[in-house]
C-alpha cells in the first residue's frame, strides 16, 4: 500500500512500484483508508511544519506518526524520518500518545548535510518503532553521516523477530481469526 498526497510524487511511486497510490492526508490516514489492511512495515517521511491546508503546525509530523501507528499491524515496524523536536523532552504529549501505541527502538539525529545532494539541509531524526508491548531501551545517538548510522540501524534491525505478523496470523486456526 502506497500513500502520497503530492501528485508528482504519486506519479513517481506508480512508476517505480506500480499499482494504486492513494492521496490521503497522512494526518488522518487511519480514518480515511477504506481497506482493513494492517501493514507489517511502514516507512514514512511526514511534513515537518505545515498541514495540508498549509497552516503552520510544529506537531504535524507527530500527528502523522500517531495516525500511521494506529494502522500498523501488531508486531509491525514503523521507520520514520522525523523532526529533531520529536522527543519525550520536547514534545511530551505527542510522544506519550505515540508510545501508547508503539515501542521506540531508535532515534538517530542526522545533520542536514546528509541531504544536501537532495536539495535540503534540514536536521532530522531517523526513528524506528515497533508495535509491541515490551520494555526496552531506545538507542539515541547523534551521527555525522550515513556511514556512521549503519551500526545503530543494524543493531535495531537485529531486534526484529524473524516471524512476521502475517506469519503469526497464518499460524492461528481460522476459527480464532474471526
Regions found by a protein language model. Name each.
Residues 1-4, 21:
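Short, hydrophobic beta-strand segments that form beta-sheet elements in well-ordered domains
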Residues 3-9, 50-129:
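Conserved Class I SAM-dependent methyltransferase catalytic core
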Residues 13-14:
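Conserved SAM-binding loop
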Residues 18-28:
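Conserved SAM-binding strand-loop segment of SAM-dependent methyltransferases
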Residues 32-43:
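A short acidic, Gly/Pro-enriched loop at the edge of an enzyme's catalytic core
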Residues 46-47:
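Conserved NAD(P)H cofactor-binding loop of Rossmann-fold oxidoreductase domains
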Residues 114-177:
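Flexible, glycine-/basic-rich loop-and-beta segments that form/coincide
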